[in-house]
């Protein structure tokens, strides 16, 4: 049965086509701020139990869509699935975040790295993509909203792989980058091949847009960012499938702290650039001059403010971008686990309401 996408506003915005309103989805929209997510996670037994079982991943992917009229779903998974598939031994210790049992720190460690067989090691992710697409679609083939697939960037994955987990200063991975750039580039080359293969597998399974999360690109100095992060994002994009089943598959790239390099990111071949909250959205639109769509960029902590303040800040973001195509509303980073769900409802409602008013010329 041919499928019909009932709400394609998000995809049209990414392609800079006119829309009746500004679409919104939120980074980490399926997460710990939702009581129903915590209940499902308890049933799954752990975060990895949740992410590695397609039924659970599907359930939590859909949970925010049941609460809020969001314009896209994003696959529930984790950016560290690729290094886990490489055999580095991923674990999430309570209160400590991700840890790898076998960090990559020596020439011998690097020599062991290889691009994983996506089907053999990450089939649970592509199974989840297919299952989510089915769950988003009714018996008459009508799909509610598009599904986003994603991966960490080659550099961001390398940060966790070399550090062995999270870090405050990334001194281990940066030391390798400066002392042994040959090793770092070997890691990044393998990661770029793996990320491209992983995203292409998600696209083939049914992801209708993909996003590259370069969470730690902003930790690099100018110059180092281009060598160790941006160049490898560009390599991933060059290998991506950009059409599937006759439809364009837009790609989004997001470097947290990357406002300095907006023009360079926009020139990588992406359809859209994600922005954090430190960037003025209106000026960003002028800087990219319509070459790409922009996604962002409300400070996530604003969601702790009173409802009217949330609505006012949402209007400010929308007003900054103005009545132009090519904007997807999002937060400047992932939603906090402590965010009141009712405040998210206020945000989504105001983004839809005010952007419709802007389109109609009614302003605020």
Swiss-Prot record:
Binding annotation for substrate: 28-32, 78, 160, 215, 333
Bridged cysteine pairs (disulfide): none
Subcellular location: Cytoplasm
Keyword terms of this UniProt record: Cytoplasm, Decarboxylase, Lyase, Porphyrin biosynthesis
EC number: 4.1.1.37
Family: Belongs to the uroporphyrinogen decarboxylase family.
Free-text function comment from the UniProt entry: Catalyzes the decarboxylation of four acetate groups of uroporphyrinogen-III to yield coproporphyrinogen-III.
UniProt protein name: Uroporphyrinogen decarboxylase
Species for this entry: Burkholderia pseudomallei (strain 1106a)
Lineage per the UniProt record: Bacteria, Pseudomonadati, Pseudomonadota, Betaproteobacteria, Burkholderiales
């Amino acid at each position: 049965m041919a499928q019909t996408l009932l709400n394609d506003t998000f995809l049209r915005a990414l392609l800079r086509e006119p829309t009746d309103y500004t679409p919104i989805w939120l980074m980490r929209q399926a997460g710990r701020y939702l009581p129903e997510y915590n209940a499902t996670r308890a049933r799954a037994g752990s975060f990895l139990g949740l992410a590695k079982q397609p039924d659970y991943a599907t359930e939590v992917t859909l949970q925010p869509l049941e609460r809020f009229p969001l314009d896209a779903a994003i696959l529930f998974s984790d950016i560290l699935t690729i290094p886990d598939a490489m055999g580095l031994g991923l674990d999430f210790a309570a209160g400590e975040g991700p840890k790898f049992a076998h960090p990559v720190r020596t020439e011998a460690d690097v020599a062991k790295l290889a691009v994983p067989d996506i089907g053999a090691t990450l089939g649970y992710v592509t199974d989840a993509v297919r299952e989510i697409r089915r769950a988003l679609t009714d018996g008459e083939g009508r799909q509610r909203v598009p599904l986003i697939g994603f991966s960490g960037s080659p550099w961001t994955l390398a940060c966790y792989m070399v550090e062995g987990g999270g870090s405050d200063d990334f001194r281990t991975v940066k030391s390798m980058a400066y002392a042994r750039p040959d090793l770092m580039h070997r890691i990044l080359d393998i990661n770029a091949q793996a990320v491209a293969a992983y995203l292409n597998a998600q696209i083939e399974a049914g992801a209708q847009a993909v996003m590259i999360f370069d969470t730690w690109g902003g930790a690099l100095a100018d110059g180092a960012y281009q060598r160790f992060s941006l160049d490898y994002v560009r390599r991933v994009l060059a290998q991506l499938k950009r059409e599937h089943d006759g439809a364009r598959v837009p790609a989004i790239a997001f470097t947290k702290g990357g406002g300095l390099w907006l023009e360079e990111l926009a020139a990588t071949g992406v359809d859209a650039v994600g922005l954090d909250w430190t960037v003025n959205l209106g000026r960003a639109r002028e800087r990219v001059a319509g070459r790409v769509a922009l996604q962002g960029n409300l400070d996530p902590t604003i969601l702790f403010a009173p409802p009217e303040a949330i609505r006012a800040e949402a209007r400010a973001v929308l007003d900054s971008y103005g009545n132009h195509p090519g904007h997807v509303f999002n937060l400047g980073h992932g939603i906090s686990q402590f965010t009141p769900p009712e405040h998210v409802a206020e945000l989504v409602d105001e983004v839809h309401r005010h952007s419709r008013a802007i389109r109609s010329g009614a302003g605020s």
